[in-house]
C-alpha cells in the first residue's frame, strides 16, 4: 500500500515534498521535462506527454529503467512516494 507511512501528511505537503525531491535530491529535472517543475530536459521521457501513474513512477524510481538509475537506497521510501505523487499530479496539469 503506498503512502502507508505518510498518513499524517496532507496532500499539499506531499505534493510540495515531491516537487522538492524532483528538483533537488532526486535530480529528476536534470533528465525529465515537467512543466510544473520548470524543467525542460529531454534526456528521459517527457513526463507531460506520457503522464505516468503513481505505481509506474514508483517502480521506475526504485528499480531504474533504461539509462535511469535505480534510486532505492538513495531516496527514502517516503521521498519516492512523494515524488511519484507529485509527478503523477503535475503531469496531468
Residue map of PLM features:
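Gly/Gly-Pro-rich "capping" loops immediately C-terminal to redox-active cysteine motifs
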Residues: 19-20, 29-65, 70, 74
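Extended, folded domain segments that form the structural surfaces/walls around functional sites
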Residues: 1-2, 34
Amino acid at each position: 500500500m503506498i503512502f502507508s507511512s505518510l498518513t499524517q501528511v496532507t496532500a499539499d505537503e506531499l505534493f510540495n515534498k515531491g516537487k522538492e525531491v524532483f528538483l533537488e535530491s532526486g535530480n529528476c529535472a536534470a533528465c525529465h521535462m515537467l512543466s510544473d517543475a520548470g524543467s525542460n530536459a529531454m534526456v528521459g521521457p517527457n513526463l507531460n506527454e506520457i503522464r505516468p501513474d503513481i505505481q509506474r513512477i514508483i517502480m521506475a524510481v526504485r528499480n531504474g529503467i533504461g539509462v535511469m538509475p535505480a534510486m532505492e537506497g538513495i531516496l527514502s521510501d517516503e521521498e519516492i512516494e512523494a515524488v511519484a505523487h507529485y509527478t503523477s499530479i503535475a503531469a496531468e496539469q
